[in-house]
Each structure stands twice: as C-alpha cells, then as structure tokens.
C-alpha cells in the first residue's frame, strides 16, 4: 500500500488463504517488521519468526507455522476445521522486535531465505510496510517476483498512489497491478460478489481472519 490503514495486511492474508484453498502450497511471510499484524490475525505468537531466522538464531523449517499451530493457537477450532485448504498454508511470523530493520531487509540472509522457500512452495506471499511510510517496500521490491499495491479509495490521494508507483518503478519493481479497497457495490450477487466483498470491505480490524472467511464460505449456518 502507499500509506497505512489501507487494508493491506488483511488483503494479503485473504490472498494467502485463497491460494491455499486452490491447492497451492503457500507461504505467507510477515515482513512488516515495524507494525506487524499477521500473527494477530491468525492467533499466533510473533516469536520465533523472521527476525530470528535472519539473525541466525533459528531455521525457517523450525519456526514456520502450520495448521497445527493454528489449531493450538488463538483461533476458533470449529472455524479452522471448516476452512478448506488450511493444510496448504504455512506462515512465518515477524519474530522478535529489532532496531535494525533496514539492515535486516538488505541482508543476504533474506535473499537466501527466499531462494530456499521458492524450491519448497508454489507461491510465496509477503506482507510489508507501506511504500511511502518507510523505505522497506522499495528495498524488498527487487527481491520478489512481483508487487501488488493496495489503494483504499476515499482515504489515500491519487497523488500519493502515483508517488508510490514511481518509487517502485525506480527500484525496478515488477508492478503487477493495484487492488482497489473500500469500493462499495449496490449489487453483490453470487460467486463474484464473494470475492468482491473481500476486497471491498477489507480493513485491518481486530478479529480472526479465519472466522471472516468462514462466514464468506457459508460456514456460518445461522442464515
């Protein structure tokens, strides 16, 4: 995203769940080290995680979170059991807080981690800090295969979005496109509306990302 509070982390989490549901072996990496939220969404502990890996204190195979970690974590077990494809999703949380975020993101250890994960997973999805807030996203942009911007309609100015795009292009990022968040639709019908609601209503709110998915997938039998 260009700025904070655009629903970026929620959309990233939804994308990871979508890929897992489609049968893709998916790794979600929490690389927003300054304001991490992914671990909270999935009811996980932030430690041990990415920073522990990059500082040489742990191996990714040891700290990756699986469906078992989700089951024993803070999420509703019934919701998890009704979540299709959850076994295909692994998560690397942010890890312990660090002061040298920029140094860590520029490290060869991160390059090595990406290289190893590409051999093991069908898709790797990364959540990182907003482009205009700190240099983290620009730093990471040439380390990944593609970048997607999240733009919250009505909150962030188009000028800021344009500057974010310019900064990424200058860094040789492969900009794949923009997800428009907070769009309201008068007619939300059927399968297409299911996806539309995700991206229209996503915001970084408290609560379980799994429970929100369960409602969208028809897991809530109250209606």
Functional labels for PLM-detected ranges:
Residues 1-223:
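P-loop NTP-binding module
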């Amino acid at each position: 995203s260009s700025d904070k509070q655009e629903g970026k982390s929620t959309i990233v989490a939804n994308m990871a769940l979508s890929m897992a549901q489609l049968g893709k072996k998916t790794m979600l990496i929490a690389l927003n080290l300054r304001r991490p939220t992914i671990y909270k969404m999935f009811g996980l502990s932030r430690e041990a995680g990415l920073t522990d890996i990059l500082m040489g204190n742990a191996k990714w195979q040891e700290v990756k979170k699986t469906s078992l970690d989700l089951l024993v974590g803070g999420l509703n077990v019934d919701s998890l059991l009704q979540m299709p494809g959850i076994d295909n999703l692994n998560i690397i949380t942010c890890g312990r807080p660090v002061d040298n975020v920029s140094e860590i993101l520029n490290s060869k250890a991160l390059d090595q981690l990406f290289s190893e994960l590409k051999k093991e997973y069908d898709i790797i999805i990364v959540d990182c800090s907003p482009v205009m807030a700190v240099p983290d996203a620009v730093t990471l942009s040439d380390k990944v295969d593609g970048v997607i911007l999240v733009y919250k309609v009505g909150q962030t100015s188009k000028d800021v979005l344009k500057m974010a795009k310019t900064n990424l292009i200058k860094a040789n990022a492969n900009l794949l496109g923009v997800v428009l968040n907070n769009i309201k639709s008068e007619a939300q019908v059927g399968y297409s509306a299911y996806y539309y609601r995700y991206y229209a209503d996503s915001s970084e709110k408290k609560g379980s990302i799994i429970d929100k998915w369960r409602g969208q997938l028809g897991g809530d039998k109250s209606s």
